[in-house]
Amino acid sequence: MSEQKVKLMEEEMNVYRVQGFTCANCAGKFEKNVKKIPGVQDAKVNFGASKIDVYGNASVEELEKAGAFENLKVSPEKLANQTIQRVKDDTKAHKEEKTPFYKKHSTLLFATLLIAFGYLSHFVNGEDNLVTSMLFVGSIVIGGYSLFKVGFQNLIRFDFDMKTLMTVAVIGATIIGKWAEASIVVILFAISEALERFSMDRSRQSIRSLMDIAPKEALVRRNGQEIIIHVDDIAVGDIMIVKPGEKIAMDGIIVNGLSAVNQAAITGESVPVSKAVDDEVFAGTLNEEGLIEVKITKYVEDTTITKIIHLVEEAQGERAPAQAFVDKFAKYYTPIIMVIAALVAVVPPLFFGGSWDTWVYQGLAVLVVGCPCALVISTPISIVSAIGNAAKKGVLVKGGVYLEKLGAIKTVAFDKTGTLTKGVPVVTDFEVLNDQVEEKELFSIITALEYRSQHPLASAIMKKAEQDNIPYSNVQVEEFTSITGRGIKGIVNGTTYYIGSPKLFKELNVSDFSLGFENNVKILQNQGKTAMIIGTEKTILGVIAVADEVRETSKNVIQKLHQLGIKQTIMLTGDNQGTANAIGTHVGVSDIQSELMPQDKLDYIKKMQSEYDNVAMIGDGVNDAPALAASTVGIAMGGAGTDTAIETADIALMGDDLSKLPFAVRLSRKTLNIIKANITFAIGIKIIALLLVIPGWLTLWIAILSDMGATILVALNSLRLMRVKDK
């Protein structure tokens, strides 16, 4: 498909919310029906998010007609050619109307009531009584109407799915006079579908709860007046006023005030973060302390929380490898069950003199056992639950495929700067070595000189001066010069001062540059610090060390990864060998690669993949973007603060720390284990039930209970992923 055609289709994409999906098969059928609508070029259902993307033109009425088999309700979320999508609260576009249980399942309740009266009549009047039979027939017709409606259509089209199996089984049971069991099959199948829908709704709740995090209105100052307006009407550049205890409604930058903001909704951090002027704040976070004024930087549809919701919903719709296997398996599984059921019903009576009633009954039971409900939902509920749980805890997983891949990772490569370290250099050591100069005076001279340099570590020295209230702007510097590869020099009050490496002072032949002093400098360098000497042509005045501080969590994270069985942890950095070794040894990585350019990091990741197959790379998503893209799973940090991180990586840690990484690994592994357990259990219980055919013990009761039991247990097992905690 040409790029122009793809772009045209994207421009014609309409997004609709869908209410009423009961199973993944129904979602697939709805997608097929929508594709047949004239004017529709393509359609893609996102079962996890309960949405459909329609490429082309189709009315809501046409879409609902395509979903009439399941009584689906459709509402537009984003229509083509609309630059801004505004959905107010009163549209209820994102929320299903809450219907009372008795109304939502009225037919099921009435059919169940008829069964109860049917069994009462059975005990009072007997099995062959007309009243008894009519009560069971009434239950079958009322409770199974929607089932038969779809089942007959599928049968005519030779489209074999679970509803086709159930329809044939119920009709067959009624033909051979098993009214009571046929009605039980109908009711229990309806209950199974209701439970399946409930399970999916529960797993979607984590994302729906994110939608309600950010306030729909905000206090904004316009033309000197403070007014409360809807977030859809707030423009970039508006000043929003947020009082203590209020949630922040929009993304922006603080222009006035100080506060502590709880960012748990976005980053998963439980500890409030201090915020001051020029700091960024996000919609959905809680202003805990001071009153702040925020300049809006993004429209409501572009806020970080909106992007998270959108990406998570897209991720829930992505089919994981396990889901692809299940879908492919189910495609052949259902027809095979139909054939097995036919053979069970026909072969024993024809060739072995068996009773037709007995073996037809056994064949019908095989159809019920063969219903792939549990198998079909084994993966989607797990993926939706896991991705939703991860999002609430500050880990954005962009698809089930990455969730599965992360679970198989045995090697993790870390970019050093901004990942294992904070990425911001700070002054760690400052020692005055000459009694003739005061500490503050010397630091003031150092700062005045560094202020004029282009050295990347100069910002750390200036920041230290500001923190300690050391003035430097009034220091007059003359004849400032950068000494390439050595340091800098300048004249202050008639004295020439030098700041630079030990090599510079060796060349100057400074008298008090001793071997012992040089060893002290090497000790600082071996600690991962950059040591700079300040002095004149005659004497050394002091030494200052600057370093990119290691994150407090880095060492603990590496230990947890090793405990999880990830033995190969590698640090990649452009730093020199000494600095790299100091930091790598401190955090406990198993291998250290230093003095690497971005291309070298990419080449190293490719080399590691050839050796270990599955390699995860974690960085900030900026200068290490090629390596992230080449890895099996690319993980970016600080996703809340940069669009680049979210777009580049397969997984984004929304908070600016590593502590969520072990949680993401544990969650992915648990997801894989639960999916495997679900598939094994769903298939295993059916095999056991089918084996009961051999001695003739399989009944419709056993068949429906095994199917329903498997569905319930698989759903409940999958929902456990919503409770995995970030330890």
Swiss-Prot record:
One Pfam family here: HMA
Ranges in coiled-coil conformation: none
Induction section of the entry: By cadmium.
Amino acids binding Cd(2+): 23, 26
Cellular location(s): Cell membrane
The organism's place on the tree of life at top rank: Bacteria
EC identifiers of the protein: 7.2.2.21
Regulation: Inhibited by the antibiotic bafilomycin A1. Partially inhibited by DCCD, nigericin and FCCP.
Membrane topology label: Multi-pass membrane protein
Primary localisation category: membrane
Annotated PROSITE patterns: ATPASE_E1_E2, HMA_1, HMA_2
Function: Couples the hydrolysis of ATP with the export of cadmium. Involved in cadmium resistance.
Family recorded in the similarity comment: Belongs to the cation transport ATPase (P-type) (TC 3.A.3) family. Type IB subfamily.
Name under which the protein is recorded: Cadmium-transporting ATPase
Protein source organism: Staphylococcus aureus
